[in-house]
Amino acid sequence: MDVPEEVEKHIKITEEELSSAYLLLENGKLRDSISRAYYSMFHAAKALLLLKGIDPRKHSGVIRMFGLHFVNSGFIERVYAKYLTHSRSDQRLTMMSITNQVMRKLKTLLKVLSASWRELKVFWRRLKMDKKAQALNEFLKL
């Protein structure tokens, strides 16, 4: 599978996981919702890394490389890296119990994730439509 196909695959998974997270939350399936929210963010981060030719194999590598290449460069706000890191921790915690604090964090996380997902989709569409690959070249220079 070449890079654009792999990126498309992760974008599709991101969209599916985000949709599932909302549906599960609306139906009171909190643990599953937190897990799906985390995987949505994970696959979005993985897609961005693949665009730069970076392919970490572990979740910890995706989180670390996402921070290094996108947050530290200023391309993505630091708060998004925190959401990704915290959602991974929350996902692990929810296997034990659900608290009101986790529930509030999840609702906030889903709102932020929806906004950042819309931004990623707009960026990806622009990237695909640019026949001269100017957007890709600018992106890779970050």
Curated annotation (Swiss-Prot):
Q: What InterPro entries does UniProt report for this protein, alphabetically?
A: HEPN_dom, UPF0332_toxin
Similarity remark: Belongs to the UPF0332 family.
Coiled coil residues, start to end: none
Q: Which PANTHER family match?
A: TOXIN MJ0605-RELATED, UPF0332 PROTEIN TM_1000
Organism expressing this protein natively: Pyrococcus horikoshii (strain ATCC 700860 / DSM 12428 / JCM 9974 / NBRC 100139 / OT-3)
> What's the protein name?
UPF0332 protein PH1297
